Amino acid sequence: MLECYINDKQFETQIIMTEIILRNQSATMQVNTMGGYIDSLILKGREVLFPKTSVHVGDDTKLRGGMHVCLPQFGPDSKNHLAQHGFGRTSDWEIRHQNESDIGLKLISTEKGYEHVEWLLDYSLPNENEAIAILTVCNYGESPVRTSPGFHPYFTAAGTQFDFNGAPYDADYISHTEFVSSDQDAHVAFDGLKLDIRTHNLPVYALWSDRNGQYTCAEPTAEGNAFLSPARGGQFVSGHSKKRYAMKIRLMA
């Protein structure tokens, strides 16, 4: 458990973060309750995710690396009511259950419009080659709620050249974000790191990197930057219902 203090002239805040390490043979996953982050991921002894760290971006210091969930939306909100990628990555999650190779987290937010929503995150290492992330949106209210989530993994990539579903890309030229559709299965290769990614309800990938570290992102989303456009019916979770989003990363080589 880590304790962080934020000092200000008017107040002092203490944030307690719990870090958990999941294991399955040579696979390890470090999970952080602050933001529901995966701070690091190693499959079969290979570093799959660039470890979460602080990097300098211009005059700012920003978190990069690992993987976080984007909820209730991936990307910006045109009405500016919600922060970039929503509030999941800046919230403190509660542990629901924990075993050697899996963990369940829960978040109940006071964000306007989402007061009756319970967000469930499940991370697991089913074997030493695979990692699974599942987001379940539970709407216990009467009214439908709008969601268009995603996962934001930073894959380890020393070079800029990579391959996505057989098409070549250069990370130096995707800082604007390239959106690519890929139903269910995607095949990605970074510097010899070959991955299969299988998803559920996340058919649009955001390919992005700012190259402020040795990482490139291939992010499965529901509809990309959906909150920049008018709402559509498929983005809503009805009252007293649930919707599930999932991704499985499998190390191929």
For each of these PLM feature ranges, what is it?
Residues 82-127:
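Extended, loop-rich substrate-binding clefts of extracytoplasmic carbohydrate-active enzymes
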Residues 31, 123, 131-139:
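Short, well-ordered beta-strand segments enriched in hydrophobic/aromatic residues
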Residues 16-27, 32-34, 104-110, 186-253:
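Beta-strand-rich recognition/accessory modules
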Residues 143-205, 210:
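Active-site/ligand-binding surface loops and adjacent short beta/alpha elements
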Residues 28-81:
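Acidic-aromatic substrate-binding/catalytic surfaces of carbohydrate-active enzymes
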Residues 138-143, 252:
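Short solvent-exposed strand-capping/beta-turn motif centered on an Asx-Ser/Thr pair
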Residues 119, 131-133, 243:
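Hydrophobic core residues within well-ordered beta-strands of beta-rich domains
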